[in-house]
Each structure stands twice: as C-alpha cells, then as structure tokens.
Amino acid sequence: MTRFEIRDDFYLDGKSFKILSGAIHYFRVPPEDWYHSLYNLKALGFNTVETYVAWNLHEPREGEFHFEGALDLERFLQTAQDLGLYAIVRPSPFICAEWEFGGLPAWLLTKDMRLRSSDPAYIEAVGRYYDQLLSRLVPHLLDNGGNILMMQVENEYGSYGEDKAYLRAIRQLMEERGVTCPLFTSDGPWRATLKAGTLIEDDLFVTGNFGSKAPYNFSQMQEFFDEHGKKWPLMCMEFWDGWFNRWKEPIITRDPKELADAVREVLEQGSINLYMFHGGTNFGFMNGCSARGTLDLPQVTSYDYDALLDEEGNPTAKYLAVKKMMATHFPEYPQLEPLYKESMELDAIPLVEKVSLFETLDSLSSPVESLYPKKMEELGQSYGYLLYRTETNWDAEEERLRIIDGRDRAQLYVDGQWVKTQYQTEIGEDIFYQGEKKALSRLDILVENMGRVNYGHKFLADTQRKGIRTGVCKDLHFLLNWKHYPLPLDNPEKIDFSKGWTEGQPAFYAYDFTVQEPKDTYLDLSEFGKGVAFVNGQNLGRFWNVGPTLSLYIPHSYLKEGANRIIIFETEGQYKEEIHLTRKPTLKHIKGENL
C-alpha cells in the first residue's frame, strides 16, 4: 500500500515527491471527455489531478442526492487512477470556483442559519451531505488502495471569516466519516488571510493561492510557517494560469511564455496545482457571479479560463509552452504526445417551430398563488426564470409602476406587450405606462436569476435571494393576488409548439438538423439577444449579445448520430430563421485591459 506523508517535504513511500497537479472539475466536463482531459494532464508530465466537489449539484433539493452520470465522481477518480494519476479532492462545502453560490445549494437560503460558520444548523446540513459524499470518497483514499492524496477542509476561508470553531467542526465531520488522508486549507498567501483561515495551530497543513510572483508569495508563507515552528513543503494550491470572464467585459488572456516562466518559478521552490488545467463549461444556470460595491457582475457560460486546454479540451499555446519548459528544466518527468479532438461546422440549420412563452406557459409550469409576490427560493426553485402575473385596473391615463427589491433582471409586460426591462440598480425606478383608464389588464413580470455571488462580502447579502423580495407598486400601493410560474426550464420537452407566437415576446425557437458523426462544435448566437439554449434536452447555458462570448459550446456527447434538435429560449424578441454551428467560439471584441 502506497503511503503519502507531509513532513519537511511531500513523501510517497518515504521518497521525496513533488506534486505536479492540474485542476479539472468533473462537473464542468462531460464524462465522455474525462479520459481525454486526464490523459493530456499526464502527457504534460504531471502526476496529480485536483477537483472541487459541487454540493449544489449533488444535493439540488434537501435530502435528494445524485452521484450518477455526469456527477459520478467515483468514476472520474477511477479514470484518473487508471492513467496513473493521483488526486487532490476539495469537498469543502464552499468552493468559490466562479460557480453558482460558491457551490452551496440555494435551498439553504430558506433556513434560519448563518452559512460558512459554526452555526449548528449549518454544520448539521453539511454533516448530512458528508454522510453521502464521504462514504463514496473514502474507498478512493490512498490508504484504501485509491488515489486520493489529500483533501481540503475549507476554501479561502481567510478571505471570509475567522471562525476557527467552524473549521474544526468541518475537520471533525470529515474524520468521523473515515477520512484518514492529510487535510489542508488554501488561502491567499498574506498574513491576514493565513491567520484567519487556517488551523496551523492544530497542525493542519496550509497551502496558498496565487498566480504570479512565486518567490515573494512563498516567502510570506514561509514566514508564517516559521512563526509557528512548521517545517512544511511549499505548495500553491491554485496557481491561476488564466482568469474567468464576465458579461460586458473583455476576454482576459495571459502570454504563454510568461506563464511558463512563472510556473517554473513555482516548481523551483515547491509544488503546484494549475488552476485551471481544463476549465470547461458552466452548463445550465450554474455560472457564478462577482461582486463590486453594490453591483453583481455575473460570469459567462464558458469557463475556458484561457487555461492550458481550451474549452473543449484541446491543448493550447500555453500547454505547449509549459510542456517545453518542463522538458527543459524538469526532464525527470516523462511526457507523452497530447490528444486532440476534431470539431465540426454546419451551416443554415432551419427554424422549424416557434412559440411564445406566454402561450406555452401552462405546459411548462403550474402556478402558485399568493397575496404578495414570493421569492424564488420560497417556491422551491433555485435557478432559471420566474414569471409573476396579476391583473389590475388602470386608475389614470399614465400609471406609475415600481418593482421593489427585485433581482436580477426583470422584464415587464402589459397584456403581452413589452413595457420595460430593468437590471439590478434600475429595479425600483419608476416605470410609466400609458393605459386606458379603468381597463383591466394582465401584468406579467419575467425575472431572471443570473447567478448568485460566489465570493466575497456579498455572499450573505439579501440579493442572493432571487425574484421579487418585497412587492410591486402601482402608484403608491402594493398590488395583490399574484400567480407565480417557476421556470427552471428543466423540462424543454414539454414546450407546446402548437400554440401561437407573437413578435417581441419571450419565445422558444426549435431548429432541427442531422449529424452523421457527432463532433465538438459551437452554436453561434451572435444575432440573438439574450437567453438560454438546449440541444437534445441538455441545457448548454446562457447567451447574451453584450459579449464577450457570443456562442455556446456543444460537446460531441450531447449530439446524436442522426436527428438532433436545438431549442433556443430568447427573451428580447431577437431571433433568426437559420442558425450556424462553428468550429471555434464566436467572440465580441470589447476594449479594456487584459490581465
């Protein structure tokens, strides 16, 4: 049995061991491509894969657990082990990761608890999740013949809190459930975060996260170790080789040669985990959101990250630059030729059916009635859209409407006619409507949850609760008697295309095409407005013509030999009679500074 130890260095069976790791999140890459990505990691000369674990995927509703198909973490670990790769697993409840709500399930927002704290209610919820998760991970520990070297207790907690009782509680939950491998924390490498977010006083291993200036950052970590009498190896648990992207902002890139030199600096002093090695995709509604002041800044669907592998998993110029550096400076780590996947293109896929959301609403959702508007989470919904509907009489020729405390984006319609779209800070501003006095009208408000904040000071903000939190005013009073239509859009097969379509309304558009040999491709959405797309029922994620991304990645495994269908839900009234599949992503140039 192989033994892994952390002393003055990392040791495998008593021999000094340098961890050469790359991050591949199993939940961002289809299972059919796990081997491809893991093989390319091994081909680089690396020996370990690292992955987070996304709680909100494994327990989407309280007490409902999923570990099958794309969530089969055990299969991912076994695939890595079959290739001779070790694993670092980060099952901490919070993962950040530019992932919806930092990986926490949204149903926690309906509970009376303080998240990421020693609050007993929160610890109890984590414990129930760990009962399911850790029973599946423990057999894969190195001690039990698997490939897991070590596991994380919490993620960058020093950038959030200093509740050491919480960190100790998570550690205890893990150890009580059979975790025997070394445990660690990862934080920014400066004193304040290390002091707040680690358990160095309890002899829990400490790692740092950074993306450059390795000598300086490691020196800060070494200083912290020395203060506490620790003779530990240095490891960068997240070496940021690229960066994520947000709507309306430029694509962030990094020079391959500069990156290779920066990686060399890390390896001259310690061990590394490249974050990301393969970024993959935020399929569905799982993109995260940054916070800047009072603003939320949702991230795009692509998690390409300008990583060593591109979104579909093929080596990039960065991969080749790091591979060359490794061969030159660290020739003791054998390399292989990497694998490449083919892509495909397809022009002029015709529109075959279309239907307005308001027409097919009842086939997609059952209304929930209440006196005042309810939040998304109160309705048992976590992601997607929520339609609020009521009826009202107009008391003046020009009425004033206001949405009070709404998030994130609201589109208001009167009798099916678009009136106003408001986004974040605009919500709450007056909306003026010219109506026929005394006439009874239907008021519809379509609200989109564009992704919850995954990091920072707004993690506990009330804006994490989506939909309309207070109410809707006409003149100075709140309107009553609302119907709520939850639209998580997890049932596109129920769209009734036999119903009508009205120009300018949110609508579904269906496009049929045939494929002889499925290959990776991208759906060009540059002439559409905003929405989400599906292929054969799989949610590809969001699109928005503000950029910087104007396409959605379609993995080959989402396509079928023969007949295929793409359905586009578009909310702005912008669509095309034909769509196109391309070999490469479609991007929008936005002026700005790169990383």
Language-model features, listed with the residues they occupy:
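Aromatic-lined substrate-binding rim segments of carbohydrate-active enzymes
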Residues: 34-100, 171-176
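An active-site-proximal structural segment forming one wall of the substrate-binding cleft
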Residues: 72-89, 112-148
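Aromatic-lined ligand-binding clefts that engage carbohydrates, nucleic acids, or primary amines
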Residues: 398-414, 443, 513-536, 543-544, ...
